[in-house]
């Protein structure tokens, strides 16, 4: 079985879709977002297809496409859809697969199940994406604690934003977690500029050698 990686974040809107696009492209692999909530604007899957450089068949269709940009449990209820979380099984592919979650770890999929519950069941190593802005220390360390409490293995933490040496250092030291690198805000954001920024900030082998 090839490498499978779950990308999650400390919050919503922190850049994990752009990071996932860069990672999937660098791995020349596959991408899958199981649940998309919100269809009016460009979806995360469409963003990854635009930025990753992957062929269309490498960007897998979502299991659930929900109209409302909200927590999956609410978006599903508004659409009259039941999320059958037991059927959300991570595909096995012949190349690396990047699986992107929605929001943070404790985002509800249903009234009884969170994304963290799903990750604990999958038993696939996680990359935690974290901001570098004010507030990231608390959010990041809480997320690391939550993952560890559920026995979810971490490949490490990927910072997103402008350099913040002290915050990045204290998170990795206190959290005892590997710093994978940092992806700055990229402007203009294109396939080429993203690929270059990711190559400058990360070593792809770190994503292939297993949890620290």
From Swiss-Prot:
* Reactions this protein catalyses: (7R,8S)-7,8-diammoniononanoate + CO2 + ATP = (4R,5S)-dethiobiotin + ADP + phosphate + 3 H(+)
Q: What class of enzyme is it?
A: ligase
Which cellular compartments is it found in? Answer: Cytoplasm
Name it: ATP-dependent dethiobiotin synthetase BioD
Metabolic or biological pathway: Cofactor biosynthesis; biotin biosynthesis; biotin from 7,8-diaminononanoate: step 1/2
Binding site residues for ATP:
13-18, 100-103, 184-186
Q: What does the record give as the organism's lineage?
A: Bacteria, Pseudomonadati, Pseudomonadota, Alphaproteobacteria, Hyphomicrobiales
Sites binding Mg(2+) sit at: 17, 100
Q: Identify which residues the record assigns to the active site.
A: 33
Q: Quaternary form?
A: Homodimer.
| GO biological process annotation, one example | biotin biosynthetic process
Q: Which organism is it from?
A: Nitrobacter hamburgensis (strain DSM 10229 / NCIMB 13809 / X14)
């Amino acid at each position: 079985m090839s490498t499978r990686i779950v990308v999650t974040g400390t919050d919503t809107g922190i850049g994990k879709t752009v990071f996932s696009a860069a990672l999937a492209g660098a791995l020349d692999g596959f991408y899958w977002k199981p649940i998309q909530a919100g269809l009016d604007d460009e979806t995360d899957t469409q963003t990854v297809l635009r930025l990753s450089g992957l062929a269309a068949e490498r960007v897998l269709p979502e299991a659930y496409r929900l109209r409302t940009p909200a927590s999956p449990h609410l978006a599903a209820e508004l659409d009259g859809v039941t999320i059958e979380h037991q059927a959300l099984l991570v595909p096995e592919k012949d190349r690396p697969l990047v699986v992107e979650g929605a929001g943070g770890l404790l985002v509800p999929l249903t009234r009884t199940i969170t994304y963290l519950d799903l990750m604990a069941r999958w038993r696939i190593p996680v990359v935690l994406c974290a901001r570098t802005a004010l507030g990231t220390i608390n959010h990041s360390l809480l997320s690391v604690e939550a993952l560890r409490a559920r026995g979810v293995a971490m490949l490490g933490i990927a910072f997103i934003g402008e350099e913040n040496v002290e915050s990045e250092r204290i998170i990795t030291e206190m959290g005892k977690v590997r710093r994978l690198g940092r992806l700055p805000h990229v402007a203009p954001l294109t396939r080429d500029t993203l690929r270059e920024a990711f190559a400058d900030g990360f070593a792809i082998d770190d994503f292939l050698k297993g949890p620290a």
